Design a protein with these regions (language model features):
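Short S/T/G/P-rich N-terminal loop/turn motif that feeds into the first structured element of a domain
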Residues: 1-50, 58-65, 91-93
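C-terminal structural segments of small proteins and small subunits
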Residues: 60-85
Length: 93
């Protein structure tokens, strides 16, 4: 989950929508990424985060490969400079 900076020209909603567009565009382009879906927060509150990514991988190795894939790294760089806070949870079904 990401919470974006509030002191930018872009609003957090604009950043979240652009991140959604970029991450979901990776579907079908990175081996091992079965599905990437971004949810954008629909209700503003002080404790709410702005966006969440749900991504499915067939293995931990596929997740590791995704993290360093050049197409993903471009999105990471876009988000990193706009991010106030980020948390993640990796779990196995």
């Amino acid at each position: 989950m990401w919470k974006f900076n509030r002191d930018m020209e872009e609003t957090p909603l604009q950043v979240a929508e652009e991140m959604k567009r970029r991450l979901e565009a990776l579907n079908g382009k990175i081996d091992g990424l079965l599905r990437a879906e971004v949810g954008v927060n629909a209700k503003e509150s002080a404790s709410a985060y702005d966006a969440v990514l749900t991504a499915d991988f067939p293995s931990w190795e596929a997740l590791d490969a995704y993290r360093v894939h050049p197409l993903h790294v471009v999105v990471v760089e876009y988000c990193k400079v706009r991010c106030a806070s980020r948390v993640d949870v990796d779990y196995e079904l």
